[in-house]
């Protein structure tokens, strides 16, 4: 099958701003059944975690604007189509930016620490559990590293012995003894099979993840937390009357430090996994129709999928804005989780679908983001 040529991407900064119109238009063709489901509702209730400065909320504003521009929402409908119920961000300066949002896409509630959703006894248990598994990994890695060092020393020693043996071969050939010398024993093999750090991180990390997930489910998550916008205790999940006749979607971007090339590479053994489990368990109890999770490409989405398999269909893709014609080389893994008992999102989520319907040629460079005159840019 011959692959169709990608459509031309944005040609200017203004076209980048409105490129979501193209994406929404394509989606309404490929995902018509999904849009038909949405039209039966009053709209979307959105919550975000690891919220940063509100990128998901801003993206929602662009999507709704595109729907209005394309005639699928009236101006009145667009004003209330998305209700941003809650954001959650640990960093105070980011919360200040979130609090400055005052349009229709400003979160009604702004919360802080995701760990506030776990009872104190669960946090204590998880902390002890992760220390146990981290210590086990540390010992295993020290043993493996020591074995490798021993093997290298042994190989070096054998190599040195071999060189000396060659140097003395002539003398040994001439030497005659009355009795044969006893044969030396063969040198021992490796002290243990070679194990990489990545192998040990994966083995111990997945063991700790499964044990921690079982532990976190022993207690219900806390349903309220301090709200920095209201200065009081507010509901973490949107209440049933707010969700009525709406589709509930959560968009979050987990901490990338354990998974990125420049991060710790501790995977599930990193302490922030406890935070991730607090986030995930609170969502499982609320059961949004869709969870969209963003992280770096090395994120272990298959283990993540195993945690959610009882409730969600989970799929994952890696791509960057460059594939949509936007000159931002920021490859990320996007994992989408659709609730099994609703399955309201019928659009096929595959690399082929994305390529056929959303990929566009990259026709501009990052210079498009500069505001300097073109005459100056030519000199750069």
Regions found by a protein language model. Name each.
Residues 111:
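Conserved residues in the N-terminal Rossmann fold of short-chain dehydrogenase/reductase
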Residues 59-66, 101, 282, 306-311:
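Alpha-helical structural signal in soluble globular domains
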Residues 78-79, 168-174:
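Intrinsically disordered, low-complexity, charge-biased tails
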Residues 114:
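Conserved phosphate-binding loops in nucleotide/dinucleotide-binding enzymes
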Residues 56, 93, 117, 257-259:
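Active-site loop signature of alpha/beta-hydrolase-fold enzymes
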Residues 99-108:
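Short, conserved SAM-binding/catalytic segment
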Residues 120-165, 173-248, 253-380:
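Class I S-adenosyl-L-methionine
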Residues 1-96:
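S-adenosyl-L-methionine
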């Amino acid at each position: 099958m011959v692959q169709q040529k990608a459509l031309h991407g944005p040609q200017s900064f203004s076209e980048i701003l409105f490129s979501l119109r193209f994406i929404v238009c394509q989606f309404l063709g490929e995902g018509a059944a999904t849009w038909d489901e949405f039209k039966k509702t009053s709209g979307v209730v959105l919550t975000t975690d690891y919220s940063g400065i509100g990128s998901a909320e801003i993206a929602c504003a662009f999507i709704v604007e595109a729907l209005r521009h394309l005639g699928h929402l009236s101006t009145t409908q667009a004003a209330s189509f998305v209700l941003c119920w809650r954001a959650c961000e640990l960093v105070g300066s980011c919360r200040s930016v979130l609090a400055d949002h005052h349009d229709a896409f400003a979160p009604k509630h702004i919360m802080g620490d995701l760990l506030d959703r776990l009872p104190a006894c669960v946090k204590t248990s998880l902390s002890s559990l992760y220390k146990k598994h981290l210590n086990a990994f540390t010992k295993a890695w020290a043993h493996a590293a020591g074995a490798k060092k021993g093997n290298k020393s042994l190989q070096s020693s054998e190599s040195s012995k071999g060189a000396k043996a060659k140097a003395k071969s002539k003398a040994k050939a001439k030497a005659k003894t009355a009795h044969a010398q006893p044969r030396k024993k063969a040198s021992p093999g490796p002290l243990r099979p070679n194990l990489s750090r990545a192998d040990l991180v994966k083995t111990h990390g997945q063991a700790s993840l499964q044990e921690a997930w079982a532990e976190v489910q022993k207690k219900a998550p806390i349903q309220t937390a301090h709200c920095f916008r209201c200065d009081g205790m507010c509901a973490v999940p949107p209440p049933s009357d707010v969700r009525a006749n709406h589709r509930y979607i959560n968009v979050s971007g987990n901490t990338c430090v354990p998974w990125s090339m420049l991060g710790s590479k501790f995977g599930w053994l990193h302490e922030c996994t406890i935070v991730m489990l607090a986030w995930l368990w609170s969502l499982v109890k609320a059961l949004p129709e869709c969870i969209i999770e963003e992280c770096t490409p090395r994120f272990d989405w298959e283990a993540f999928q195993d945690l959610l398999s009882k409730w969600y269909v989970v799929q994952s893709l890696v791509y960057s804005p460059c594939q949509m014609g936007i000159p931002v080389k920021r490859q990320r893994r996007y994992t989408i989780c659709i609730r099994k008992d609703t399955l309201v999102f019928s659009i096929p989520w595959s690399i082929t679908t994305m390529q056929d319907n959303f990929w566009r040629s990259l026709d501009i460079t990052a210079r498009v983001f500069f505001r300097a005159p073109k005459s100056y840019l030519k000199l750069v």
